[in-house]
């Protein structure tokens, strides 16, 4: 099972001007660090002007249904370095490969501004994708509840465990 830890640091202070961010979420890559278990921890920062990042556990109907494209709102698309070129590798659950997709929980902004600025920390399990190529990275994208899609960030390259 994949574990997702969301820590949100809201910079909403009464003495400071309220932050103004676009309503479309924006990501900034922070880290892609190895863990003792052989996996990696992905850390990205995000901003969102209208404060609608994250899904409630009950968000499983309509566009968030389990078989719908937006059931997972954080997607980490797997790539391998092959012959000097980054190559997207489709991970199909029907063949036993599990995509690196996550449901970021909702964090309701506090204060008078709906704007959000926070950090997402994702514990990614060790991956055992067979093949002759040993270097990987992920393309990371976030969707908010309004289905606005963030910019895409790339993790640092890493050697397979």
Residue ranges of model-derived segments:
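Sec-dependent signal peptide recognition
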Residues: 1-7
